[in-house]
UniProtKB/Swiss-Prot annotation:
Record-level GO BP terms: threonyl-tRNA aminoacylation
All residue ranges annotated as the TGS domain in the record: 1-58
Cofactor descriptive note: Binds 1 zinc ion per subunit.
Reactions this protein catalyses: tRNA(Thr) + L-threonine + ATP = L-threonyl-tRNA(Thr) + AMP + diphosphate + H(+)
Subunit structure: Homodimer.
Organism field: Chlamydia caviae (strain ATCC VR-813 / DSM 19441 / 03DC25 / GPIC)
Protein name: Threonine--tRNA ligase
Catalytic: annotated segments: 237-528
Protein EC: 6.1.1.3
Length: 635
């Protein structure tokens, strides 16, 4: 017999028992997708050993969902090969919203997706067992996949001695690390979403491929809910709303580098202004560093050797320069402009820097995936003893910022990777424990991602949930034990000796362009008044009312409100409709009665007609709504 631990209980099992054997004794075990054994995700077919700690996962868990979607990708590939035997499967990973599979030697259209879905349904109905095969070295694996050059390339690149595995279901076998579902049966609901062109390994110089995207769920109900969410997402698409509301545009001459229009800049300025006020109150000092810096800087930071493929470089006076892809190195140079003492720590330095990173054209998408964007970075220099308290300060700042926009979020703590890290075990333990204690003290739920930290330190990622329950990874808090050392940063400690500071690198919005795209979709273009590109539109009934309208607009603009006048020849109803289509918060109609009685006829963008009110009452309420950063109308 062997003893294993599950849910903090010790269980005895026969020697040689698998996780599936154990699961069969547990109620509702048919929902299990896999098992986490000693913090490693595994197949249910895995043999258990003495002392193993188990946690079974379902579709509701991130690990279980990945297994489910990965098996779904294999079902897709098997279906395609049954319909088009000449197709060559390449890779089929899980992505944020489902999965895809890339094929060479295949030509399909959107009309073919239904036929593929029908074949996938047949494969699910066959309840094919999924089994794992471990090859005895590269030679055996290459022999198995000798007719697939893409798989052979992947095999050849594997380090010597690394385990090489494949998974089979029926006649289909795929090179894969796994894990997978025990059979095809649980994949009861799926939908193929679209096709697109792709390149092998994302390299335009390599083979052209066809990519098929899909999504899958354990039940039809969940699939229907997801498809409804996708339809709702289409209505909220920031690219469509951005054009409709005249916020920004994309130009062919600068792919991935958005043009912000005057209305978009009003939203931008409101967003940045709020960020600056918040950070000033939190003790941050703002800097601005150059976009173009010499190669020597990027060699010191490590970007030249590790990130050059994503950088835009050029020569000036026969020397190499690069447009900055990140703000961090510039802040290191600022730190070195003077001497520092432990007495000024934590030293909080913030920058909204314009950065550029190369992305392949096929990956670009509106404001969400760009080549040029602004990042709201801050670097906090501190002593090791200050890490926990300062992390808690940042987490409190995160809470205040995201609640201002009505956004829910969750946190993920990523710990030390197994290989290729810098810093001592003691320092890693100190840093990770400090971040974890800060998370606990913040009373915010979080999960731990073992081994998913950066090579230079542990990190906390901030995942935001929008109005239709999608999650977006926005901000991050990273403890950096690397750059201060590379740049030879120093401070005088309490003993009067020179020490290297610890650095917390954090971004709350992340990419401001991306965050703005999220906000457009979250609010469906209906910005709260303080963020809105147009607070009030004055609508005249006749030409004789124009002077009064312009007088009011000028007075209100001096109060910091964004006010326009529609004195066109359109009918009043058409003017109101135009304003509502542009999501103007309030429409004020001016006619003879309003001017005589010094009152206002007010309508909201949701077509609520308000009781007539005085100018003073209206403006005082509007200013309160704006200055309080209210998410809901006060009228």
């Amino acid at each position: 017999m062997i003893r294993v631990i599950c849910n903090n209980e010790t269980v005895e099992l026969p020697k040689g028992a698998t996780a599936a054997d154990f699961a069969s004794k547990i109620k509702n075990s048919h929902y299990f997708a896999g098992v986490v054994i000693n913090d490693q995700i595994k197949d249910l077919s895995t043999t258990l050993n003495e002392g193993d700690t188990l946690r079974f996962v379902t579709f509701e868990d991130s690990e279980g969902r990945e297994i489910f979607l990965h098996t779904s990708a294999h079902i897709l590939a098997q279906a395609v090969l049954r319909l088009w035997p000449q197709a060559v499967p390449t890779i089929g990973p899980v992505i944020n919203q489902g999965f895809y599979y890339d094929f060479a030697n295949l030509s399909v259209s959107e009309e073919d997706l239904l036929a593929i879905e029908n074949m996938m349904e047949q494969i699910v109905q066959e309840k094919l067992e999924v089994s794992k095969k471990t090859f005895n070295g590269k030679e055996e694996a290459l022999k198995e996949f000798m007719h697939n050059a893409f798989k052979a390339e992947l095999i050849q690149e594997l380090p010597e001695g690394e385990s090489i595995t494949a998974y089979s279901q029926g006649e289909f076998m795929d090179l894969c690390r796994g894990p997978h579902l025990p059979s095809t049966a649980p994949v009861k609901a799926f939908k193929l979403l679209r096709t697109s062109a792709a390149y092998w390994r994302g390299d335009p110089s390599r083979e052209s491929l066809v990519r098929i995207y899909g999504i899958s769920f354990p039940t039809t109900k969940e699939l229907k809910e997801h498809l409804h969410q996708l339809e709702e997402a289409k209505k909220r698409d920031h690219r469509v709303l951005g054009a409709k509301l005249d916020l920004f545009s994309q130009q062919e001459c600068s792919a991935g580098m958005p043009f912000f229009h005057p209305r978009g800049m009003i939203v931008w300025d409101a967003l940045i202004g709020y960020w600056q006020r918040l950070h000033q109150l939190a003790g941050y000092k703002q800097i601005l560093t150059p976009q173009l810096m010499n190669r020597s800087l990027w060699e010191t930071s490590g970007h030249w050797s590790n990130y050059k493929a994503n950088m835009y470089t050029l020569k000036i006076d026969e020397e190499d320069y690069a447009i900055k892809p990140m703000n961090c190195p510039g802040c290191m140079l600022y730190y070195k402009t003077r001497l520092h003492s432990y007495k000024e720590f934590p030293l909080r330095i913030a920058e909204i820097g314009h950065v550029h990173r190369y992305e392949v054209s096929g990956a670009l998408s509106g404001l969400m995936r760009v080549r040029a964007f602004h990042q709201d970075d801050a670097h906090v220099f501190l002593t090791p003893e200050q890490v926990e308290e300062e992390t808690l300060n940042i987490l409190n700042l995160v809470s205040e910022l995201y609640s201002t926009f009505g956004l829910e979020y969750h946190l993920e703590l990523s710990t030390r990777p197994e290989k290729d890290t810098i810093g001592s075990d003691e320092l890693w333990e100190l840093a990770t424990s400090a971040l974890e204690r800060a998370l606990i003290n913040s009373n915010t739920p979080f999960i731990i991602n073992p081994g998913d930290g950066a090579f230079y330190g542990p990190k906390i990622d901030i995942h935001v949930k929008d109005a239709i329950q999608r999650t977006w990874q926005c901000g991050t808090i990273q403890l950096d034990m690397f750059l201060p050392e590379r740049f030879e940063l120093e401070y005088t400690n309490a003993q009067g000796e020179k020490s290297t500071p610890i650095m917390l690198h954090r971004a709350l919005f992340g990419s401001i362009e991306r965050f703005l795209g999220i906000l457009i979709e979250h609010f469906k273009g209906k910005f709260p008044l303080w963020l809105s590109p147009e607070h009030i539109r004055l609508i005249t009934v006749a030409d004789r009312h124009q002077p009064h309208a312009k007088e009011l607009a000028a007075a209100w603009q001096k109060l910091g409100l964004v006010v326009t006048v529609d004195d066109s020849n359109e009918s009043v109803s058409k003017k109101i409709r135009n304003a509502q289509n542009m999501q103007v918060n309030y429409m004020v109609t001016l006619g003879d009665r309003e001017i005589e009685e010094n009152t206002l006829a007010i309508r909201t963008r949701d077509n609520r007609v308000l009781n007539a009110m005085t100018v003073e009452t209206f403006i005082n309420t509007i200013l309160e709504e704006k200055n309080s950063l209210s998410l809901t109308p006060l009228l």
